[in-house]
């Protein structure tokens, strides 16, 4: 008899986890308090699919003192194991993303190629010093001259200073929400169920597994049973708390996970603003906008091509878990204009903000929670959605008792 697994949260992490579990033969039910998949943090996040490059990101992003202290303490504990395992997971994840696209026929408006801008000689020298270490981790990174970068991205502003660039093999961009929507359908074909507008109130061990208490919490304008809806959407459920037993559960619900875990996790909120606009198509100017992914660490900015649209993301800010941040969308517009001037239709801009969980050391929280039957798939953000597919695959393998494709022991919550 196959085991029953509850997945809490239907963001990209939850959907990929549900698919991988269903593909291994588990009976999967996904609980999501919103009305669809990838509605919250996954909706407005960066479109990048980036390998993990330790040491490249600037650790001086705005953050409260408490978080900086926790990051310092966690960094002393983490060691090289976590870094090497994350690099291996990064490689696996990008390969798994490509594999799912090909095997399942997913079309998430993907584009291949990722360049990281090095605006001056100082940043170029710093990156060059890290290059050997990255390659020792098995990461395929190449330092290219500015002229080569401009050949690969002909839409770059000729007047924007550029010393060199890092070219990341297997990196690229894609529409994370579109990927999640299509993978959800594949998970449903394997028997996974999705219950939207359903809030999980508590998870408790009862000796025979986990008892999950959930409640149907529809919005006031929720459709009736007779209303037209997409295939597979949740029908209205009985009102009031409902108890349901599962063999195991996976928390993919970000900042809400500690409440269900019943323990304190050193999580902060990472905020990221994004602007999405249609690519400007002008006869005689075929190279407006990026061909794929472009990152400017000095401006905390990423620009990514997704089909006929461009997504600009940045303004990463870390706060306490419940704090809010006013996004600076104008900074994103200025950054886009700096690198790819005149490339989008500003009259049709969509603005958004992602708010996701971030661990004390900035690394994912993956694996067994320490409570029997309860697993974690949290804190995957920061540099796009490059870790998502591999994390889900490895976690499903561990739950199934299989040998994981890569070791993630150092990425478990026990390190914190």
Which sequence ranges carry the predicted segments?
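N-terminal Rossmann-like FAD-binding beta1-loop-alpha1 element of flavoenzymes
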Residues: 3-30
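Residue-level detector of alpha-helix initiation sites
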Residues: 11-12, 255, 382
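Glycine-rich FAD pyrophosphate-binding loop
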Residues: 23-44
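Active-site substrate-recognition segment that forms the wall
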Residues: 38-49, 53, 58-75, 108, ...
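Rossmann-like flavin
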Residues: 74-186
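Flavin (FAD/FMN) cofactor-binding core of flavoprotein oxidoreductases
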Residues: 117-121, 147-152, 269-270, 325-404, ...
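A conserved short coil-to-beta-strand element within the FAD-binding core of flavoproteins
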Residues: 146-147, 152, 172, 196-211
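Conserved beta-strand-loop-beta-strand element in the redox core of flavoprotein oxidoreductases
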Residues: 201-243
């Amino acid at each position: 008899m196959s085991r029953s697994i509850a997945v809490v949260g239907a963001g990209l992490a939850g959907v990929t986890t549900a698919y991988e579990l269903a593909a291994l033969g588990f009976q999967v039910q996904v609980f999501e308090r919103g009305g669809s998949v990838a509605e919250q943090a996954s909706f407005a996040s960066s479109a990048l699919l980036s390998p993990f490059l330790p040491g490249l990101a600037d650790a001086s992003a705005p953050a409260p003192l408490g978080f900086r202290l926790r990051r310092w303490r966690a960094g002393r504990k983490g060691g090289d194991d976590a870094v090497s395992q994350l690099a291996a997971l990064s490689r696996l994840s990008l390969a798994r993303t490509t594999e799912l696209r090909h095997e399942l026929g997913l079309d998430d408006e993907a584009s291949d190629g990722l360049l990281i801008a090095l605006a001056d000689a100082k940043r170029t020298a710093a990156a060059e010093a890290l290059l050997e270490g990255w390659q020792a981790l098995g990461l395929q990174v190449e330092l290219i001259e500015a002229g080569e970068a401009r050949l690969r991205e002909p839409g770059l502003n000729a007047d924007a200073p550029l010393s060199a660039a890092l070219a990341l093999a297997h990196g690229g961009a894609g529409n994370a929400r579109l990927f999640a929507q299509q993978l959800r359908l594949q998970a449903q074909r394997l028997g996974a169920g999705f219950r939207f507008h359903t809030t999980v109130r508590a998870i408790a061990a009862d000796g025979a597994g986990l008892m999950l208490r959930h409640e149907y919490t529809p919005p006031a304008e929720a459709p009736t049973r007779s209303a037209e809806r997409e295939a597979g959407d949740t029908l209205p459920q009985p009102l009031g708390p409902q108890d349901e037993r599962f063999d195991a559960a996976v928390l993919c619900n970000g900042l809400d996970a500690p409440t269900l875990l019943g323990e304190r996790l050193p999580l902060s909120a990472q905020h990221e603003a994004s602007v999405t606009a249609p690519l400007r198509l002008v006869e005689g100017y075929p190279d407006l906008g990026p061909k794929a992914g472009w990152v400017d660490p000095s401006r905390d900015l990423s620009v990514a091509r997704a089909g006929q649209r461009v997504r600009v993301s940045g303004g990463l800010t870390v706060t306490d878990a419940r704090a809010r941040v006013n996004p600076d969308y104008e900074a994103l517009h200025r950054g886009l204009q700096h690198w790819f001037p005149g490339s989008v239709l500003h009259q049709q801009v969509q603005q958004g903000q992602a708010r996701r969980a971030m661990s004390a050391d900035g690394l994912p929280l993956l694996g067994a929670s320490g409570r029997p039957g309860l697993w974690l798939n949290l804190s995957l953000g920061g540099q796009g959605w490059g870790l998502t597919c591999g994390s889900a695959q490895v976690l499903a393998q561990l739950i199934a008792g299989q040998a994981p494709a890569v070791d993630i022991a150092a990425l478990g919550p026990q390190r914190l």
